[in-house]
Amino acid sequence: MSREMGELTQTRLQKIWIPHSSSSSVLQRRRGSSIPQFTNSPTMVIMVGLPARGKTYISTKLTRYLNWIGTPTKVFNLGQYRREAVSYRNYEFFRPDNTEAQLIRKQCALAALKDVHKYLSREEGHVAVFDATNTTRERRSLILQFAKEHGYKVFFIESICNDPEIIAENIKQVKLGSPDYIDCDQEKVLEDFLKRIECYEINYQPLDEELDSHLSYIKIFDVGTRYMVNRVQDHVQSRTAYYLMNIHVTPRSIYLCRHGESELNLRGRIGGDSGLSARGKQYAYALANFIRSQGISSLKVWTSHMKRTIQTAEALGVPYEQWKALNEIDAGVCEEMTYEEIQEHYPEEFALRDQDKYRYRYPKGESYEDLVQRLEPVIMELERQENVLVICHQAVMRCLLAYFLDKSSDELPYLKCPLHTVLKLTPVAYGCRVESIYLNVEAVNTHRDKPENVDITREAEEALDTVPAHY
């Protein structure tokens, strides 16, 4: 091991929020997470609202976001517990005078709360999202007592919607495909579901400004036309409220792509700030033709501050916005090196990165974990926008894609984002539809899979086994 490399391995760029013990391994010190622990005690997020008000949509999106920023979160959907306990027949199961069904529903709630306790207290979960109607003060009191007994914080999210068109669209988009209505006539489904809503309306008790003034909550009116926020008490609740005030349900598409092939891509060198190759310039014009063919209304174009994304955007002939946050991951001392050179000069660092690619931070550079934090403002703004084309870089595109597709931190660094390919993301009910469009301009392959042997003592041949070909 060279003296230079030894110094790099032992002298870390410190960005550590949580101190590690002095006996930590080299890998622990290299990981050096920059992610703060957002929770000092677990949080229960409690959904409130009548059926067809978007509670599951909100639960799913919020869970995806919190997991993406590094806060372990899980949804507990009471409807799933109910379906496991009893087969659904019709709306009469939800009648307030159906005492037998009321007992079953309460037992399902208690079973779900038991699983919440297991997740938050034994499985190192930080946030549990309790996705149910919770429309009565009695049910909410039961949950509050449960949270108090176990030392959990509670944050309520109430979705209120009185617009018949929005409610009808939600029923059409989601409920017609519900497991409760498999192989049922659509008109009968609509009739039954509207009667189900009427059953809940009888005893619905919204969160009250005076009676519930001591509680932490956000009320969302008509899918975001107005908000009411009360007693936000910590970081998780603050981020949750801010996130919910930025999302919308307007139909749109997000186009993600990398810059055209660069001169450094051709030579197998990572990072740097080189311009486009001849094929990269050809791709830029192909991208312009593709975007024009889509006939996208009010399209916004975003790039990083790096030459290769700007040159790609210039061919579009439209205004574009530059984001420094979209710059490629900083490879530190390894900038503009080939993988072969990194293995030759810093073999231990190369192995450490393969062992935990998400948390590994390049000496004097960044990790994917750092990059996710850098990109959070981009995600917030993407959620606020309608149609956007983001021209970015491989690591950046992986992070953005992981958010929209709900990929784990283990999967994120290995998502395939090839050059000269556009990914069209269209948000749907509880996820995102992805279309991959290759624009028929050849480019080098820059994707490197995780090698089988990640041990520090491995041979160079094993370390370089998955390195793609380059000039």
From Swiss-Prot:
Gene3D superfamilies: P-loop containing nucleotide triphosphate hydrolases, Phosphoglycerate mutase-like. Its EC number is 2.7.1.105, 3.1.3.46. Beta-D-fructose 2,6-bisphosphate binds at residues 258, 265, 271, 308, 339, 353, 357, 368, 394, 398. Phosphorylation at Ser-33 inhibits the kinase and activates the bisphosphatase. InterPro entries: 6Pfruct_kin, 6Phosfructo_kin, His_Pase_superF_clade-1, His_PPase_superfam, P-loop_NTPase, PG/BPGM_mutase_AS. The modification N-acetylserine is found at residue 2. It catalyses: beta-D-fructose 2,6-bisphosphate + H2O = beta-D-fructose 6-phosphate + phosphate; beta-D-fructose 6-phosphate + ATP = beta-D-fructose 2,6-bisphosphate + ADP + H(+). Keywords: Acetylation, ATP-binding, Hydrolase, Kinase, Multifunctional enzyme, Nucleotide-binding, Phosphoprotein, Transferase. GO terms for cellular component: 6-phosphofructo-2-kinase/fructose-2,6-biphosphatase complex; cytosol. The record marks 393 as: Transition state stabilizer. The modification Phosphoserine is found at residues 33, 141. Beta-D-fructose 6-phosphate binds at residues 82, 105, 133, 139, 175, 196, 200. One of its GO terms (molecular function) is identical protein binding. The keyword Signal does not apply. The keyword GTP-binding does not apply. Residues 2-250 are annotated as: 6-phosphofructo-2-kinase. It holds the Pfam family 6PF2K. Synthesis and degradation of fructose 2,6-bisphosphate. In the C-terminal section; belongs to the phosphoglycerate mutase family. Homodimer. This is 6-phosphofructo-2-kinase/fructose-2,6-bisphosphatase 1. It comes from Rattus norvegicus (Rat).
